[in-house]
Design a protein with these regions (language model features):
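Alpha/beta catalytic barrel-like cores
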Residues: 1-74, 84, 93
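Helix-rich catalytic cores of soluble enzyme domains
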Residues: 81-105
Length: 105
């Protein structure tokens, strides 16, 4: 049996129903939360969520405030490479990746 919990919730989603449920879980279990999105979900062009990195972060912070989630909350990014731009030439795809990295950081 595990005597000490050494892991924390970490999710890679842009679904705000899932994010809300995860924040509530972390809140009531007094855990930090790590949230990531992929470059397909959120990027400088909006991704398939139509959210840019700063918009995604803002929506997360608004949600956290709404449900009074005051635990440690980390926002990360997953797969910042050129995959969403695989149909572009290599140089343009890499430039898009670099721009996304800068927008996220």
């Amino acid at each position: 049996m595990i005597k000490i919990n050494k892991s924390y919730p970490s999710l890679c989603t842009s679904n705000f129903d899932v994010l809300k449920s995860s924040m509530i879980f972390a809140k009531y279990n007094d855990l930090p939360l790590l949230v990531e999105s992929t470059s397909n979900q959120v990027n400088q062009f909006g991704g398939y969520t139509y959210l840019k990195p700063k918009q995604f972060c803002k929506k997360l912070k608004i949600l956290a405030k709404k449900i009074k989630f005051k635990n440690n909350f980390y926002i990360g990014a997953d797969h910042l490479g050129p995959l969403p731009w695989k149909n572009l030439n290599e140089n343009k795809a890499m430039k898009n990746s670099i721009k996304l990295f800068k927008d996220v950081v």
